[in-house]
Amino acid sequence: MLSFTSVFSFFLHALLLKTAFSYVIKRNNPVFDYTSEKVRGVNIGGWLVLENWITPQLFTQFSSMSNPPTDEWGFCEVLGADEAASQLAAHYSSFYTESDFATIASWGVNVLRIPIGYWAFNVVDGEPYVQGQEYWLDQALTWAEQYGLKVWIDLHGVPGSQNGFENSGKTGSIGWQQNDTVTRTLDIITYVANKYTQSQYASVVIGIETVNEPLGYGLDMDQLKQYDLDAYNIVNPLSSSVATIIHDAYVDLSIWDYGVVSPSSYNLVMDVHRYQLYESDECSKTLDDHLSDVCSIGDSIASSPYITVTGEWSGTLADCTIFEEGVDSSTFIGPNSGDISTWTDEYKGAVRLFIETQLDQFERGAGWIYWTAKTGGPSPTWDMGLLIEYGVFPQPFTDRQYSSYCG
């Protein structure tokens, strides 16, 4: 049976379907106005949520094991609570510091997306996670405010796992939407929203993301849309300057057109992630194929009725870094580009053109957030700082060495 809310949202959206930014309700004196400012951001990946390919130095200690852990759940389970807590404390205090935030601000970045797992706020019996991440999130907000950066708080992993990937905290099957996992997640959203919409964070926190990369084809989309509406109804009444960020779940944006969350909703932003490397056929494409795909992505973003930010993307043209494989286990297609100092001018130019084209197309929407600010392994096309150092990522972001590929 349809609820009154879903019926009302359907008819409201039907009236506004052909609109884009012009009908989005303007915020009163917003800290960040997504309808007039472009998000030019970077993710703080691999810090408060472990990803083995970003910080391989934390996972190579398990290399002699027949079934080594690949995620934070396994990391904590194998090491035990005390040793895991000790190693993670050292990681949190060193992988990102205040000087990193100062450097990031100097690049011209205006928004940070900071991933954090549900276990930072809620751990139950049977879950091996250790905590301590919330302290460092608070520290990051202090640094961000000091250097004029705005922040999205991104709930990167939820109970049960929303996608079965290591970035959710636990690799394997998708267990979210089973038992009490959604209720637990909404309780965490309530805690995060109540805390980070308080006045001391008003000048820095501009978004709370309900869940990172829920895998649409492995979930009940109606339940996901209802969850996003419930989360929106938690966050939105608390602040006029903190947007609710929802992820597109890797389904066509048109599938959201008749969801329970209307694109005209006050303070609502759609997050899309666009990579071209996680399947073998994508890795083997020519540069022209990749660029043409970017043009098509730009068309989709520009036609979306949602305020749309490309919240993850990279300059990576090949699936080629330690611990990082595609969804279909595609790997090592294309040049082994792990040492940027060995790149030819031709390859640098190809990556630069790919990045420039994505910047142009993603700004047809509300902007972009690169994945990621830095890595601890041989992954230069994922490392914004390294790309900037070698002149592959534009500085300033509007600088262009190539004419527009998409016309």
UniProtKB/Swiss-Prot annotation:
Catalytic EC class: hydrolase
Q: Which UniProt keywords apply?
A: Cell wall biogenesis/degradation, Disulfide bond, Glycosidase, Hydrolase, Secreted, Signal, Zymogen
- Span of the secretion signal? 1-22
MF terms in GO: glucan endo-1,6-beta-glucosidase activity; glucan exo-1,3-beta-glucosidase activity
Q: In which family does this protein belong, per the annotation?
A: Belongs to the glycosyl hydrolase 5 (cellulase A) family.
| Record function comment | Beta-glucanases participate in the metabolism of beta-glucan, the main structural component of the cell wall. It could also function biosynthetically as a transglycosylase.
* Protein name (record): Glucan 1,3-beta-glucosidase 1
Organism of origin: Schizosaccharomyces pombe (strain 972 / ATCC 24843)
